Amino acid sequence: MTTFVKLRTKAKMPLVGLGTWKSPPGQVKEAVKAAIDAGYRHFDCAYVYQNESEVGEAIQEKIKEKAVRREDLFIVSKLWSTFFEKSLMKEAFQKTLSDLKLDYLDLYLIHWPQGLQAGKEFLPKDSQGKVLMSKSTFLDAWEGMEELVDQGLVKALGVSNFNHFQIERLLNKPGLKHKPVTNQVECHPYLTQEKLIQYCHSKGIAVIAYSPLGSPDRPYAKPEDPVVLEIPKIKEIAAKHKKTIAQVLIRFHVQRNVAVIPKSVTLSHIKENIQVFDFQLSEEDMAAILSLNRNWRACGLFVTSDEEDFPFHEEY
């Protein structure tokens, strides 16, 4: 059974990776080390998570121990929206690279399609609390990122949270040198993303699913929000296969040839979440999970929903 997805660059991206959003400094280092020991090779990072330095320490320690080689790892990071101008993009990238203590990234993504005003704040607002946008677009950012590939600092480029119209704009960009190899999006039984996944795959773009467990620890959860980890149908499927609910939620993506990056800092969960290659969900199981879709999102920069390039107004 294959454990990776092949990108258009011929690189192999492991189907299960470790997410690091919300992993607190002080815990993320041990989590990454435990994950390497458990067999993870794909690590999903981002400038805006403010914990890349510890992730880098963990990777370096494991390389020194000869537990893993750099070339066997698949390290991903993301450019935040306040750095879309080329000079700022270079600075942000250099900080990511030095924090991660690497000399190249396997994949560099545009984290979110809307540009935000440059400055110290990740979410800049005026005195009225309105989010300040940037004149620079994701197309400007892409040009700078392409130079990183040409310099050998990044192996491949991708996007995150893009709808298919935005991907289309990028693919049709005059003078495009490097096509996106991935689109990383929220995906779980309440947001199955069937049309977007179909579109991406038709364009040779791999999909990475974030928040596959419904992001239960997101800081802005409302009490009335649905809880993906408590869906009765998933519990039933898990019991039938003698697997955990999380394992079924992760396996659901693997069987769609979608990479998946569950986040955990709990040792037992880290081990469990990658043990998804020894069972198969039936066609009935898959159909039942897909039927749960309600286009419900746990994540998104909803404060910018009135601005240009907000990605989630479109059907897909």
UniProtKB/Swiss-Prot annotation:
Intracellular or extracellular location(s): Cytoplasm
PROSITE patterns linked: ALDOKETO_REDUCTASE_1, ALDOKETO_REDUCTASE_2
GO cellular component: cytosol; mitochondrion
Keywords attached to this entry: Cytoplasm, NADP, Oxidoreductase
Superkingdom to which the source organism belongs: Eukaryota
Key word Cytoplasm present: yes
Enzyme class: oxidoreductase
Activity regulation description: Inhibited by tolrestat and epalrestat.
Primary location recorded for the protein, binned into one broad class: cytoplasm
Record bears the keyword Phosphoprotein: no
Molecular function terms, GO-annotated: aldo-keto reductase (NADPH) activity; aldose reductase (NADPH) activity; prostaglandin H2 endoperoxidase reductase activity
Site residues by UniProt (Lowers pKa of active site Tyr): K78
Catalytic activity: an alditol + NADP(+) = an aldose + NADPH + H(+); prostaglandin F2alpha + NADP(+) = prostaglandin H2 + NADPH + H(+)
Activity profile over pH: Optimum pH is 6.5-7.
Active-site residues, record numbering mapped to chain: Y49 (proton donor)
Positions bound to NADP(+): 20-21, 44, 160-161, 184, 210-215, 263-269, 273
Enzyme Commission code(s) on record: 1.1.1.21
Family the UniProt entry places it in: Belongs to the aldo/keto reductase family.
Function text: Reduces a broad range of aliphatic and aromatic aldehydes to the corresponding alcohols. Reduces prostaglandins. May play a role in the metabolism of xenobiotic aromatic aldehydes.
Subunit structure of this chain's protein: Monomer.
Name of the molecule in the record: Aldo-keto reductase family 1 member B7
Organism: Rattus norvegicus (Rat)
Upper taxonomic lineage: Eukaryota, Metazoa, Chordata, Craniata, Vertebrata
